[in-house]
């Protein structure tokens, strides 16, 4: 089965450890992530200004690319891309005036009215693959690995584009259980990582990181699993600064959900690119006998 796939910019530069494991894992699960042609940046942040329709052109054009392929669904991995594409799609579905203005402006494109559904790969795993079927494919159960699911902002907010229940999401926990790991709930599962304050107020990022990471550790987690490259960067860079200032803080391994998926499916560290991760996750994996000692990353 072929799934229309929108990668977004970061997965082609700084987040190969999010994309490569996903592509390989879906092949094992019987699906192919087929990159849509001529895609462009999603726009990164959804614009809320009524008089700023030009910022909707980028995400809508990507949805048009999917429609041109005859597909009615597009899969994303990056939660920021998901959020922006979903909100632009809702605009095109629900606001006839703005839909007309945008279609008129993009007069060289086919008309678009929200025909494509935007889904996250987590939703594909849950609703199309199924947790039971996924568990049956696991070759290396992640037993003994205690992982805190970190959702961040954009997977769950605003409510109309959330991939799960906003107050009590379980989709990441269910994935971890299917892979044999132990999910560890903690109160800061949806707290903001600081987002683009890394640009405007970089000194604040370690404070966000400490609040989130320390909470996860205090609830018994050994690592975090996440979906967003910006969350990964902020928590990773934040903990680097924390380790400089606090000798007792050793850092927290950060995993993308696709890496744990690929590892459990038996695809090996070469697919997972653990060398690109923050928090030296390979040390934890070796301790749990999930990565052979001396295995090249």
Located regions from the model:
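Iron-sulfur cluster-binding electron-transfer modules in prokaryotic oxidoreductases
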Residues: 1-297
């Amino acid at each position: 089965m072929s799934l229309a796939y929108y990668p977004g910019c970061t997965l082609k530069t700084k987040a190969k450890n999010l994309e490569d494991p996903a592509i390989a894992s879906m092949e094992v699960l019987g699906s192919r992530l087929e990159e849509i042609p001529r895609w462009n940046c999603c726009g990164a942040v959804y614009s809320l200004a009524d008089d700023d329709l030009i910022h909707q052109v980028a995400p809508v054009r990507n949805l048009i690319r999917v429609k041109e392929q005859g597909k009615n669904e597009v899969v994303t991995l990056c939660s920021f891309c998901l959020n922006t594409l979903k909100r632009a799609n809702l605009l095109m579905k629900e606001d006839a005036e703005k839909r007309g203005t945008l279609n008129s402006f993009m007069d060289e494109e086919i008309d678009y009215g929200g025909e494509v559904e935007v889904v996250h790969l987590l939703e594909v795993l849950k609703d199309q693959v199924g947790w039971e079927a996924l568990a049956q494919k696991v070759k290396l159960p992640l037993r003994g690995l205690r992982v805190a699911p970190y959702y961040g902002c954009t997977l769950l907010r605003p409510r109309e584009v959330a991939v799960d229940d906003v107050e009590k999401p379980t989709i990441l926990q269910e994935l971890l259980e299917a892979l044999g790991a132990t999910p560890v709930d903690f109160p800061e599962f949806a707290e903001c990582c600081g987002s683009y304050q890394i640009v405007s107020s970089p000194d604040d990022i370690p404070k966000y990181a400490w609040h989130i990471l320390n909470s996860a550790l205090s609830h018994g987690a050994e690592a975090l699993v996440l979906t967003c490259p910006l969350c990964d960067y902020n928590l990773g860079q934040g903990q680097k600064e924390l380790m400089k200032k606090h000798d007792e803080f050793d850092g927290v391994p950060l995993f993308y959900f696709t890496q744990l998926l690929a590892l459990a499916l038996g695809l090996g560290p070469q697919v997972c690119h653990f060398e690109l991760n923050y928090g030296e996750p390979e040390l934890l994996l070796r301790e749990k006998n999930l990565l052979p000692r001396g295995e090249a990353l």
